[in-house]
Amino acid sequence: MTPLNGATAWLITDGKAGHEAQAQGVAEALGLTYEWRRVAPVGLARMLAPWGPAPANFDQHFTPPWPDVAIGIGRTAMPALRRLHRLAGLATFTIALQDPRTSDRIADLIWVPEHDQRRGPNVITTLIAPHRFTPVMLKALREEPHAVIDELPTPRVMVAIGGTAKAWRFTDDDAHQLAAAIETMGQDGASFMVTTSRRTPPAVATAVSQAL
């Protein structure tokens, strides 16, 4: 039980699975009763986000009674969160997950992982982004037999490989360094559990595969 158990919430997202997992994880951890508010701006509104206007159909989906909490995540979700913040006022505590790339005034609280550079009086940081894996869930997963993983020798190393994004690009040197590190650990007796992203460059995936 948390002090917010049973409070109402709207989760405002762009529909991306990674964004929704973060918003849902926070809502569940707080014990909120939540509803989804997905936005999909098009044309100029999408290009201007997070600075542009709220979606044209905002008034159809964002109407009183206002929720106790609103959690927004994703660049294109920020205009809707900003407008809700202004309309609901003190009735709704607003939270922006990840760097909203706009004014601190967009929400009551901005929550970013430490690797983001965003800092401010209403900004909090955690080592990583929020997620849905609670201690209870992790304990259950550890205790659940898994034939493939259980056969791997220890130590076991999890390698989660992302990909190129607007703020960062995988270089050939990055791929070589990652592959070299995996090869070195493998020579020391480690086994690996590797997952890639849809944005992982093929050259990186190939380099890692060859190093295993």
What residues fall within each predicted segment?
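Short hydrophobic signal-anchor/transmembrane segments that target glycosyltransferases
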Residues: D174-G189
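Active-site and donor-binding regions of nucleotide-sugar-utilizing enzymes
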Residues: L11-H131
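Extreme N-terminal starter segment of soluble prokaryotic enzymes
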Residues: L4-W10
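Catalytic donor nucleotide-activated moiety binding site of glycosyltransferases and closely related
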Residues: G189-L212
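Phosphate-coordination loops involved in phosphoryl transfer and adenosine-cofactor binding
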Residues: G6, P67, T154
